[in-house]
Amino acid sequence: MERINTRKALVGSVVSSVNDKTIIVAVDIYKKHPIYSKRFKKTKRFAAHDEQNKAKIGDIVKIIETRPISKTKKFRLDKIIELAKEGN
């Protein structure tokens, strides 16, 4: 029987990189209200493992689900999609 890769992949921006090998990524999730059908934005913050400390604040990154690394870290950095603009 073939095993299917069902890991979640999320794209968001880095809002904190203070801790060693850890980044906090804010992911915007758009939902639709079940009764009123209005779309609204919900922002969730995920702690992700960054082994080489590459990501900086403002970068757009892709994180993927992995085994639990600590109490709050269940994602790891997959790749940096876009670097933060300098001077802002």
Curated annotation (Swiss-Prot):
Name by which UniProt lists this protein: Small ribosomal subunit protein uS17
User: Which gene is this protein's source?
Assistant: rpsQ
**UniProt function note:** One of the primary rRNA binding proteins, it binds specifically to the 5'-end of 16S ribosomal RNA.
GO biological processes: translation
Looking at the record's lineage, which domain of life comes first? Bacteria
Q: Which InterPro entries match?
A: NA-bd_OB-fold (IPR012340), Ribosomal_uS17 (IPR000266), Ribosomal_uS17_bact/chlr (IPR019984), Ribosomal_uS17_CS (IPR019979)
> GO molecular function, one example?
structural constituent of ribosome
**Keyword RNA-binding recorded:** yes
**PROSITE patterns from the xrefs?**
RIBOSOMAL_S17
**Keyword ATP-binding, does the record have it?**
no
Question: Belongs to which family?
Answer: Belongs to the universal ribosomal protein uS17 family.
Q: Which SUPFAM superfamilies match?
A: Nucleic acid-binding proteins (SSF50249)
One term under GO cellular component: cytosolic small ribosomal subunit
Q: Which UniProt keywords apply?
A: Ribonucleoprotein, Ribosomal protein, RNA-binding, rRNA-binding
Subunit-structure text: Part of the 30S ribosomal subunit.
